[in-house]
């Protein structure tokens, strides 16, 4: 959710606001009835605390607890808000009378603690809530669910668990602008830019995702990283790279089988200061094409390039400007290029084609073709966005 050095940060590090362009906006209405007056009681068939009965990929059980089964799928033990000592929200969360269509995976960008206790997990959940409410001004925790490095799973925003168990409605979150109703947000404690999640966290993540998919009818292919939709490092390079594996393992828990091709999604590369190579050079040509960069592209993502990205983001009304070239800015920057044109956008195509030794390029280079040239092709990442009226707080 945040970035290194900002334990619980969201806004100020991520690019907020609605995604520019002609993205699909899904219909849906806010739940019109009064919300519950108290944290709803767990269902009679709900899970009970205890060690997990579901072995992880390494054969070891995770600590989140998953004894009961629902339609053959393990039910994780998820601590409700009152169990980890949550504050009362500033005002009741909104509940939408619709199901989410995907899951977004985040990391907290906090410390990779070695304290795997339930007490440490609860302290972390409270710290996130305090930051979101006191620094960001949100009504409650932004994410729907939180998983600690010890594998303990907790409800994030109030009523998220009750609505998940019901399987028909969703609590409006604040974990990613444009994805706060149509996507369930899961925070994973730690920073995963250079290390992998703990086995306990990983096991709880896959079990929790499988249960969410079951209750809401979400396909296991519809698991994404925060960076797929925003200009952010989240959920870290290592955790993001593990998403194809996560999709396959979640599918397995649901009794399905996904091939490596089916579990791979087309993405936009995340470019940042210090990167080098043809992708950076192509991006520089596109930035010059857009009027945001002057001078000769040299394939180095330096301060000049970061400033150009920031200028482009400002021009496209990003709420936050951070100089990271990721899933929000690429679709705006990589415009359609047609054969026969001789401009900087066409030169960007030539740079990538030469780097990948592509002998022929289609007459029209659109987003899927750009992603092939960038080497990140796969099944498309859908651009569906939240319905109108989402508060993003």
Regions of interest found by a model, annotated:
Residues 367-371:
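Short, solvent-exposed linear patches
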Residues 110-119, 190-199, 267-274, 294-297, ...:
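Second-shell loop/turn segments in exported
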Residues 135-144, 215-227, 295-297, 321, ...:
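Surface-exposed patches in mature extracellular/periplasmic domains of secreted proteins
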Residues 98-137:
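Active-site acidic/histidine clusters and adjacent loop/turn architecture
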Residues 339-358, 391-393:
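C-terminal extensions
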Residues 285-298, 316-319, 351-364, 380:
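Extracellular-facing binding/remodeling surfaces
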Residues 2-8, 18, 26, 33-97, ...:
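Basic/polar, cationic surfaces and motifs that engage anionic cell-wall
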